[in-house]
Amino acid sequence: MSEFVTVARPYAKAAFDFAVEHQSLDRWQDMLAFAAEVAKNEQMAELLSGALAPETLAESFIAICGDQLDANGQNLIRVMAENGRLKVLPDVLEQFIQLRAALEATVEVEVTSASALSDEQLAKISAAMEKRLSRKVKLNCKIDKSVMAGVIIRSGDTVIDGSVRGRLERLADVLQS
């Protein structure tokens, strides 16, 4: 997967720089998100790994995307198809989002809990993470019953596991060693 990230980075950077220059970050993120979903589609994945000519592949991909891509987005698709890189579109989107977050000095934080958290709890988590990361945070909340109780907080390569499940797993590791 790190190979795809390396391959995706220059495309994401080019799209990001273009979007910043033309003040169209939202539009580009939407286009990349749509194109990434198309690339993830099972039938499209088969086409991407097939032996279609790059021009045919690009035009098919653009036709499927329809009016979701403007002329510049279509050009990106053509260049990526020419280089056989359409399958890395989800990674391009991920890199684009990271570049945008760095520009806006925000970081996405994933909060996983066993049940929905109150606004007060979310505010406390947000404040604590902003202090710890020295950046504004955007919380993405998920519910996972297997957490049992507590929360798991992920931001980049930082993981704070305050869940009962995590504590039980650590206890089991200690008891088995």
From Swiss-Prot:
This is ATP synthase subunit delta. Belongs to the ATPase delta chain family. It is a peripheral membrane protein. It is found in: Cell inner membrane. GO terms for molecular function: proton-transporting ATP synthase activity, rotational mechanism. It comes from Cronobacter sakazakii (strain ATCC BAA-894). Coiled coil: none annotated. Transmembrane segments: none annotated. F(1)F(0) ATP synthase produces ATP from ADP in the presence of a proton or sodium gradient. F-type ATPases consist of two structural domains, F(1) containing the extramembraneous catalytic core and F(0) containing the membrane proton channel, linked together by a central stalk and a peripheral stalk. During catalysis, ATP synthesis in the catalytic domain of F(1) is coupled via a rotary mechanism of the central stalk subunits to proton translocation. This protein is part of the stalk that links CF(0) to CF(1). It either transmits conformational changes from CF(0) to CF(1) or is implicated in proton conduction. F-type ATPases have 2 components, F(1) - the catalytic core - and F(0) - the membrane proton channel. F(1) has five subunits: alpha(3), beta(3), gamma(1), delta(1), epsilon(1). F(0) has three main subunits: a(1), b(2) and c(10-14). The alpha and beta chains form an alternating ring which encloses part of the gamma chain. F(1) is attached to F(0) by a central stalk formed by the gamma and epsilon chains, while a peripheral stalk is formed by the delta and b chains. GO terms for cellular component: plasma membrane; proton-transporting ATP synthase complex. Keywords: ATP synthesis, Cell inner membrane, Cell membrane, CF(1), Hydrogen ion transport, Ion transport, Membrane, Transport. It holds the Pfam family OSCP. Its main location: membrane.
